[in-house]
Design a protein with these regions (language model features):
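Conserved aromatic beta-strand anchor motif in extracellular beta-sandwich/beta-rich domains
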Residues: 167, 203-205
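Surface-exposed coil/turn segments at beta-strand junctions on protein surfaces, enriched
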Residues: 111-113, 158, 184-186, 196, ...
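Short, solvent-exposed beta-strand-to-loop segments that form ligand-recognition rims
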Residues: 178, 198, 205-225
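Short, aromatic/His-centered strand-loop micro-motif at the edge of beta-sheets
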Residues: 167-190
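Extracellular carbohydrate-recognition regions
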Residues: 5-64
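Short tryptophan-centered beta-strand motifs in secreted/extracellular beta-sheet-rich domains
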Residues: 118-120, 186-196, 201-203
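Secretory/extracellular carbohydrate-interaction modules
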Residues: 83-163
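Ligand-recognition surfaces built from glycine- and aromatic
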Residues: 8-14, 217-251
Length: 251
């Protein structure tokens, strides 16, 4: 009897050690309330630039404070982890990732690791309120207040309903390509960023390639990490429940 597709898609490639495959794989559907704390210990804090942790039963995240937050952690709702549940103020937000060290999981080395991917499924209450809503991979480096200040990046960015591809190479200016695909208020979509072993990046929106795309290749030897960067515009984005987050080697 063949292996069911819903099981087979999680099986590791024979060419990759099982322990290493499992170590690089992250899946979270945000059903349980996390424990929050400051990186390094103590209570979570909300000053611009602060870094905190969110610990779920099976996964761990870090979040970097953008602006100033009096609500110190995002909360779980019936839909998922609501990244919009902190302060509703223009230029306030957060970046969600798994830590900024190349030793932290999951990070990937272009040209050394096998092909890898990130998948995020989420909803946006008010798309006109997203100053930036970025999902993708960036260089493993210190968290930045401005997403355009990362040295290298390949991501999808939802701005005022437009789904854009945004890329950065070697600290140069951000290159923005409008996919011409759109996101309406309260809609739920799935974004996927795929990186080949050679660093070639492709994108999917709800399982299909964008209408308009842009070529990009990460530099060989670069360490990259998955991230979600969310920042309020003056109109405010409201609830942004993250329903699924999955990252690892491509099957």
């Amino acid at each position: 009897m063949p292996t069911p597709a819903n099981i087979a898609k999680y099986q590791y490639k024979d060419s990759i050690n099982r322990r290493y495959w499992d170590e690089k794989f992250i899946y979270e559907n945000f059903k349980e309330n996390p424990v929050s704390a400051a990186v390094g210990g103590g209570a979570a804090t909300g000053t611009a630039g602060d870094e905190n942790v969110l610990m779920f039963p099976a996964t761990g995240f870090e979040y970097h404070i953008l602006g100033t937050q009096t609500i110190l952690a995002p909360k779980i709702t019936a839909e998922g982890l609501d990244l919009g549940s902190m302060d509703a103020t223009a230029d306030d937000g957060l970046e969600l990732n798994h830590g900024i060290l190349s030793s932290q999981i999951p990070s990937f080395t272009v040209g050394t690791d096998a092909a890898f991917y990130l998948r995020a499924r989420f909803s946006i209450a008010d798309v006109s309120g997203t100053d930036d809503c970025v999902v993708g991979f960036r260089k493993v480096e210190a968290n930045q207040a401005n997403v355009d200040d990362y040295a290298d990046m390949a991501a999808l960015n939802v701005i005022s309903g437009d789904i854009n591809i945004e890329t950065i190479v070697g600290g140069a200016a951000t290159v923005t390509t409008d996919t011409t695909d759109n996101w309406a208020d309260t809609e739920t979509h799935e974004l996927r960023i795929l990186v080949s072993a050679a660093g070639v990046v492709t994108y999917q929106i709800d399982g299909a390639a964008p209408t308009t795309t842009a070529a990009y290749t990460f530099t060989d030897g670069l360490n990259v990490m998955p991230f979600f960067y969310l920042l309020n515009d003056t109109d405010l984005h409201g609830s942004v429940p993250l329903m699924e987050w999955e990252c690892g080697y491509q099957a």
